[in-house]
């Protein structure tokens, strides 16, 4: 396994639509292993293949129990409700924005062997599914927010909300 460099906003790879995975082979397994390690090292909750320069429909995310889910060729098959909250992105380091997302999401995907499965999540996991799948179509969360905040500004906003 190896750490991969995470691309940042402005890199053209982050604006491209990713191709589906067709071969479930050792190269895919290496990519998934590297993405897992890169996500663990970064401290994030999700990572999409284009963020490491690979234009394939592959995502790794942490679920509510902090288990790592590998999603190959994922699609959202169900979404319900609405939530409004802050999110950030490893490709937009140090910046956060308020984004509307569904409060519950089910995705259908394939595992590293090509077997189909469904995974569901609510609140933060639903947010993460939506956020990461948008990367596969060349989009960043900043397209959904009117204003970006630094970590310090976000801390102040959150502290005000607790009063």
Residue ranges and their predicted role:
Residues 1-163:
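Positively charged
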């Amino acid at each position: 396994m190896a750490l991969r460099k995470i691309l940042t906003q402005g890199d053209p790879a982050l604006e491209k639509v990713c191709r589906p995975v067709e071969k479930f082979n050792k190269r895919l397994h290496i990519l998934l292993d590297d993405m897992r390690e890169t996500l663990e090292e970064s401290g994030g909750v999700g990572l999409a293949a284009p963020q490491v320069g690979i234009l394939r429909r592959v995502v790794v995310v942490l679920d509510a129990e902090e288990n790592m889910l590998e999603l190959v060729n994922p699609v959202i098959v169900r979404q319900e409700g609405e939530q409004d909250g802050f999110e950030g992105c490893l490709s937009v380091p140090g910046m956060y924005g308020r984004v509307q997302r569904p409060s519950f999401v089910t995705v259908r995907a394939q595992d590293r062997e090509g077997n189909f499965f469904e995974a569901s999540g609510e609140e933060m996991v639903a947010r993460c599914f939506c956020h990461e799948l948008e990367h596969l179509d060349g989009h960043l969360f900043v397209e959904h927010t009117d204003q970006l905040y630094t970590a310090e500004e976000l801390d102040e906003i959150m502290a005000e909300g607790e009063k």
